[in-house]
Amino acid sequence: MKIKTILTPVTCALLISFSAHAANADNYKNVINRTGAPQYMKDYDYDDHQRFNPFFDLGAWHGHLLPDGPNTMGGFPGVALLTEEYINFMASNFDRLTVWQDGKKVDFTLEAYSIPGALVQKLTAKDVQVEMTLRFATPRTSLLETKITSNKPLDLVWDGELLEKLEAKEGKPLSDKTIAGEYPDYQRKISATRDGLKVTFGKVRATWDLLTSGESEYQVHKSLPVQTEINGNRFTSKAHINGSTTLYTTYSHLLTAQEVSKEQMQIRDILARPAFYLTASQQRWEEYLKKGLTNPDATPEQTRVAVKAIETLNGNWRSPGGAVKFNTVTPSVTGRWFSGNQTWPWDTWKQAFAMAHFNPDIAKENIRAVFSWQIQPGDSVRPQDVGFVPDLIAWNHSPERGGDGGNWNERNTKPSLAAWSVMEVYNVTQDKAWLAEMYPKLVAYHDWWLRNRDHNGNGVPEYGATRDKAHNTESGEMLFTVKKGNKEETQSGLNNYARVVEKGQYDSLEIPAQVAASWESGRDDAAVFGFIDKEQLDKYVANGGKRSDWTVKFAENRSQDGTLLGYSLLQESVDQASYMYSDNHYLAEMATILGKPEEAKRYRQLAQQLADYINTCMFDPTTQFYYDVRIEDKPLANGCAGKPIVERGKGPEGWSPLFNGAATQANADAVVKVMLDPKEFNTFVPLGTAALTNPAFGADIYWRGRVWVDQFWFGLKGMERYGYRDDALKLADTFFRHAKGLTADGPIQENYNPLTGAQQGAPNFSWSAAHLYMLYNDFFRKQ
């Protein structure tokens, strides 16, 4: 039965009024604190991330801050430069304006604030007013409008100085090193140009800190003539005006000679018609807010969180650069290891799902970026991995692909939620061509999982690791390191590994393939993959457990001709099985839309087989929860690969069958009961990454305690799917009230302490922002 929704004139008027209010960026001042004046190139917080929150937009490779007081007013401090794969500050303040009247410096009062899409300063004195608005005009250039109101002539002075000091944590120097001393080839140089100045940078290839081409420049262009004096790493520019004037300045960070050449025409056009570019930016942001803020039931505080999420995701958008030929979205522009254009699939699926609702073009581009490096037949590096999607792509290729990058990673992929994300983009845009474009890529990805990660061939893929120099010898023997006391020895081969495990003469084992398998899950040190601290393991053994309960086993996956394809953990993961269920479900839906009924039928059959297996084999009736299962030498009588790994405790993988819709109602009822139990997951901030009863639980442990917003949202969607929406709404309200910093002006961070609500991890974090936006859409309501 179809239900018609009839909107009365009053309802329509309220919705139109809400939409108009929501789209007004001026209603959302200072949602994120963008003030600051960096004193160091690496001005880190307690966790080694840059501690300020510069404004980035339009995929730009540089960002600006607001002044933090009188000393920095008139400029937009920073500048934050993205040096291919890292964020580094260039200056404490660069191009700071001071105004002089009759030979005296004008004493202004300052009002500075951010709105979505702009930074604004208002400088006020008795006879002079200055209003400065900074927006982004292109993916490489920001535009500053400076409106000066005065009845008298004025002298304008701009100044700036490049940073000298290298590094600090929470404002305290980590050393007395200078930038020039640490990077002698950086060779920063300020030069005057016809209408401004530029900073040129020498070539530095410091793999883990600073990457420049030797061709990069930071350019400043002004719409009025200036006289510039340069003294080493300092400059002063001067101009005279006879009264009220509006002037324009462009700032461009250009990373290659080709970019330097290409952007000059853009800069000339921007200065020729600045109002066009400013209006385009304003209208673009009004459109983001109009599309994105569609929940009239949310409180004003919850709506501000949604705006913070939109600002965060758009700020982490990067335009094409280096090996990444598409726009993309990174985990965190200020994150130590998450900046530049570093792109992960797992983050992408979630980012794109959210951004489809307010920035669908970039949602598509982000997914395209990931699949642009999907392994094709005849690949020169890993021909055995056709369909594989690398874990991390970035500006620079790995040495194996002819680059000098250290971040590019093909050791693993990420869980198969790609089709879920692609389908959400379609649901929002109704773009059938989008499905036609992505469908064959998704099929190849799906087939790779079954070919390269299904050791026992039962259609239930495992997490694992690729064939890679980090995992195996040249001859294909798996590497591992045995540690005992202060001695360690690297060995190779599965037979040797089995003997070492059986003898037990070790304190710990380090297995690169195990690390990669946990990365492949998206949950880096989760208990289910055998990760547990020594103290926790000692306690577990003292309470009657066995150390071997936490020892993982591996299998080689080989093609029919014996070629080593990679490795699988000898356990089938319930979350990956559930994601694969969804993958089949969405592929069937796409195949139907694209007129491929036979393919749709096959994927529906595969989905049903997975659902049957998940409920038969992965649910433990004693503890009433879903778990991974061990792969034994022979299948059990019921067709299962083995028994659930109950001893490693409960984690969010247990509600993955609910989120993906694979659970039976009876099993879902049981799981929800566990989720709502205060002795398990219903903590101060609920639904952490390990239950309180898990032997490996730690409130501050990355994936064995902390609350990640994606797993939280997965849990709520699973509850809703099986009839527990009211309970989900209560948990959402608890999260909103207890997760610290959400409604303040701090950045969105990676995760939260389940017992205290304290924020943890990288700031300005995309997938947290994505899922906070989804929470706003789905669950945030006035209570």
PLM region spans:
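Bacterial N-terminal signal peptides that target proteins for export
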Residues: M1-V10
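Terminal accessory carbohydrate-recognition/targeting modules of carbohydrate-active enzymes
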Residues: K2, H21-R304, T334-Q342, W346, ...
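Bacterial N-terminal signal peptides
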Residues: P9-S17
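Aromatic/His-enriched, Gly/Pro-containing loop or helix-boundary segments
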Residues: Q129-R135, D385-W434, A762
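Extended glycan-interaction surfaces of carbohydrate-active proteins
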Residues: L255, P296-Q342, F371-W408, V460-V574, ...
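Structural helix-adjacent loops and short alpha-helical linkers that scaffold large soluble proteins
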Residues: T294-T303, M355-R368, V425-P440, A591-Q609, ...
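Alpha-helical support elements that line or immediately flank enzyme active sites
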Residues: N341-G378, G654-T664, F712-R725
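Long, repeat-rich segments with strong aromatic
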Residues: L569-K596, D700-D726
